[in-house]
Amino acid sequence: TQADKLFEGIDLSLLGDDLQPDRLVTAEDLARDGLAFPAFYGDDMLLPIGKTPAYLGQAVAILIYHDFARFRFAKDKLKFREGTIKYGAQTGPLQRDPWGTFRYVRVGGDKPFDDDRFSSLKDTPIFPISMKKHLPVWPEGREGGKLDQEGMYYAGMIADELKTPPDEWLVMSRRYTTQSVDTSALEPDNANGWFDAETQTLHLVVPTQSPQEVADEMPRMLAKRNPPVKQLILHPCYTVGYGSKDHFNFPYYGAVAAMYGDGHPVRLANDRFEQFQTALKRHAFDMNYRIAVNRQTGVLQSFHGEMTADGGGRSNFTPSVVMVAATAAQSIYYFPKSDLSAVGLASRAIDAGSARGYGTLQSMAATEMMVDELAAELKIDPIEFRLRNVLKSGMKNTQGAIPAGAIRADEVLEKAAKHEMWLQRAKRKAEFESQHPGKRYGVGFGCVQKDFGTGAETSFARVELGEDGRIMLHHSGAEMGTGMSTSQSVLCAQWLGKPADEAHFSVTDWSVLPMVTSGDPYVMSQADQDRLQTNPAWTPSYCSPSSASNSAYYFSHSTREAARLIFDHGLWPAAMAIWQSGPGGGQAAPLVVRREDARWVEGGLTAAGMEVLSLERLAKQLYQMGGIAGAAVHVFNRWQWAEADFTLSGNSERLPIDGLAVRNAGGEFKTLPRNQVYYPPTQRNNAAVTYYSAVGTLAEVAVDIATGQVELLNHHSIMECGNLIVPELVSGQLQGGLAMGIGHALHEYLPLYEDGPGNGTWNFNRYHLPRASDVAVWKQTDDILPALSETDPPKGMAEVVMIPVVAALVNAIADATGHRFRDLPVRAENIREVLQ
């Protein structure tokens, strides 16, 4: 569909009589039968006649066939045919207000550790008071006024200072743009469904990163049908999406197709052309940055950033993507003053949503390119310049929040500065260029730290120990190729001595622990939270999708806490009962045996020199004693964990969970009401991020001055991500993220509008995904900082790994050619234009 004319219907005469669909579903059918998208996805699941499409390629009808052969022939006949859709009057594209707008202003104290004069966490983020010509109108700045007015007063102060800076300041202004890309998940969107009209039951198999969202929203959608669907039997399955299958609308199209399948099972599945045409895209960004630095000290002073992202024609996660982009733009640096705003525009492009990197890829890569240019202007080594300005533990981010734990980006920088690729770069450049006439050699560096989590992270986990010592795990998280099904199983070993024997993921039935939610965890008032939390089953958010690099830290928390409860209230009492059995208190009596001395060793559990007890023996004892053999927990994190008091074994315990059910040996699960709950204050939403993991990447390139072709000779990454649960999975994430970052920097590109994927003609014949030959597959190396201790939590790192290589490559090209590119991707034709 074109997005500048009225839609007037479809013409299927090209199919003749033999290839007409057995069922044609249009917007009129959906309206008659009461079927519509959940509110999150907006209006017009299928476009009604007489309306202008909201975006290029918007769906207008579903054609259903009872046999595959006719379907295949019909599909081939219609593909790439423009006459099938009929248009009316020219209207121009729809003009709409932005999908989301955010602004974060901070003015720190005289020193980094002093109290802020103004910040989002201490005071408030700033939101527009209205829209004018579809652009935000900000509050009037006023010292001592309302919080948002005071914020704008400080924003004005920052702008004035950058306009007329002190003599010792260097102020640099640059514009950066990044492209729209397809996440290129190699499983296209699909759904298998069957509607049993006799029982009014819909069976649906869908690959999704957010099974709980489908399980929650789809029954509501189907309940409004005329007549209502009585039951949904949902089968979420493993998938791969890189974000594109998180809160995506395809499952709802699959459900609708099944509803009109005339009793037949229906498969709705994109081919690769259709996947390019309809799948969620990464947001294209346009960024204007202004950064001030003290010329004498080389210390950053102020950062003003304005970003716009193209959110496409249907709002998805655009508001949170632009929010995350703004709050991440500082990268690894401390800025005493900052004013960062981001706007997510509505356009006629394909809808953009969650994609690996989630706005930070765009904003942080730009910061890293600019920092390199500032270092060159000041004639300071780029890594030394970074070290002078790196955010250190206890310093505040641009929202005024202190990040969690030790910030170790400085260690990453110090390690990179000592790497031979960096130390030998001048010598290698001279040698390479003398041996390869016609090629230019360059080395570049980038280092970022990215948040993991969303500020409303929730999950369920249920762990059970059988009398035979078998461990069973149920988890709400979805496996999407990251290996979380392996890592969550492995985590059980910390408390139970071995990985889970049986594990289930994308679990949507949590009747063993009934929790309820209401309100929006991001915008609710403190008064509302205080009122709602008096219900012991209430939680601010029910269940998170697999997204935001959340499995290693957040999903692991629920798994570990469930396993810990079985150890504390089942296995440890069982172990003590065995060790203390016999005359005079048994083998334990002569020694001091504490729970904190417990260790799993080969063969079982020991503590303070006690006999090693196998898990099977412990389980048998636990079941004889009737201890806790199963625990189901719900957890919530708003940049810190919710805690609650529960009565266990007659004692009150405060646990970092907000819901709990336990199963005693031989019994059924029983929900334990919490006595008191301690949710993080709603003001903590303004922190926007507190958890970080850091990665630095060195890249070595050769540029052919005749063709502009960039050859990636080698790259080395240094990562800090706490304790590794499964090192092989971390390595896989690092290598895969690097490949995606290389593609973003050098190869992948989609036009946004009429020439882009919305026209249905895009496939991998036109879209260059990086291959092994593009990523230095046999030469790349990595270095992972050891954890500070065995108690360090694992950190989410699946997104951060793809970001620094983008800046490293662009900085390396600048080192090779002498020209700084600011628009991504940097392709051969862009380099040829400059060199010739």
Give the location of each predicted region.
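Flexible, low-hydrophobicity surface segments
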Residues: 1-124
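Short acidic, glycine/serine/threonine-rich loops at helix termini
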Residues: 8, 34-39, 74-77, 188, ...
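C-terminal catalytic domains of large/alpha subunits in multi-subunit enzymes
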Residues: 27-30, 224-229, 259-266, 322-438, ...
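Phosphate/diphosphate-binding loops
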Residues: 59, 66-67, 263-311, 555-584, ...
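Helix-loop-helix junctions that connect adjacent transmembrane helices in secondary transporters/permeases
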Residues: 107-222, 390-468, 683, 697, ...
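Short, aliphatic-rich beta-strand segments
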Residues: 201-206, 470-475, 712-714
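Thiamine diphosphate
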Residues: 233, 238-269, 277, 484-492
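Active-site and channel-lining beta-strand-loop segments
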Residues: 288-296, 300-303, 463, 698-717
